[in-house]
Design a protein with these regions (language model features):
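Glycine-rich phosphate-binding loops of nucleotide-dependent enzymes
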Residues: 1-283
């Protein structure tokens, strides 16, 4: 996490495209300056401006979910066009709730209401996301088979058109979308999984810490795409172990021991509040 770098480093050197773009004492950086240097743009200012844009005052409910361990009646609530963050220490129920919501989309579950199709972007793409023997185009199209069929068979043309659209839209760097998915870098593999989710009919996208270990350039591109799709009405539930990613969210639910222990608006969000909620006596 960037916070660990800022706390522990004596000196910070930022490289981009093989060149040193800034080098200074760690004390001269805050998170804003570091993210800006890594992304090559006023990244956080852009985030703040885009999220501050007016949203509809009343949006339809997309998800209402209560963790199994929750005894006080607190629900996670997400409406159309919202980006909802799930925070807290890893392994405290965030992934469990996302998987329960994903399952509830096809089978009713007590304590969970889902009103639109759901897609999941897994954090462990190797074991939970990628079809290793398939091409990039096939990996993207698997969630959209109904639209890609021509009779009983998949139309290669429709599959190629879908893949080409998302290659351009999300910036998947490859000379040929028919190449095997493992020909891509890790960041581009993750982009392909986002393309799979966003190219489908899903109006609810569950993100299970999908940007862990991904380079900052890819992260910033995905952040832009998530905000763009949210502005069009898609709902995102975003679990992340990286506090700075929560700047993209409208509301943040903090988890501890399988329960929601805090609900913060984005303008209330600080790393200190998340830490206090994660370690405090609220649960």
């Amino acid at each position: 996490m960037l916070g660990e770098v800022l706390r522990n480093a004596d000196r910070i050197v930022v490289m981009r495209d093989g060149k040193v773009v800034v080098a200074d004492a760690a004390s001269a950086f805050d998170r804003d300056r570091l993210v800006t240097a890594m992304g090559g743009a006023e990244a956080r200012q852009k985030i703040a401006a885009q999220i501050a844009a007016a949203k509809p005052s009343a949006s339809p409910l997309r998800v209402r979910a209560r963790p199994a361990a929750q005894k006080d009646g607190t629900d996670l609530v997400a409406c159309a066009g919202e980006i909802i963050g799930l925070a807290g220490l890893a392994g405290h129920g965030q992934t469990d709730l996302l998987l329960a919501i994903f399952a509830a989309a096809s089978r009713a579950r007590t304590g969970i209401e889902v009103t639109a199709p759901v897609a999941l972007v897994a954090g462990d793409r190797q074991s939970d996301g990628i079809f290793p023997q398939w091409s990039i185009a096939q990996n993207i199209g698997i969630r959209s088979l109904a639209r890609l069929r021509n009779g009983l068979l998949i139309s290669p043309q429709r599959e190629a058109e879908l893949a080409a659209f998302w290659q351009k839209k999300i910036g998947i760097r490859t000379p040929d979308m028919n190449n095997n998915i493992f020909s891509l870098s890790g960041g581009n593999q993750q982009k392909a999984l986002f393309a799979r989710a966003l190219g489908s009919d899903a109006q609810i996208v569950l993100m299970d810490d999908p940007m862990r270990g991904v380079d900052i350039g890819t992260k910033l591109e995905v952040y832009d795409l998530v905000r763009e799709e949210a502005a069009r009405g898609r709902t995102f539930l975003w679990y992340t172990t990286e506090t700075e990613e929560l700047d993209n969210c409208d509301h943040i639910y903090v988890f501890k021991n399988g329960r929601i222990v805090a609900n913060l608006r984005r303008d209330e969000l600080t790393e200190e509040k998340i830490i206090q909620s994660s370690f405090g006596d609220a649960a």
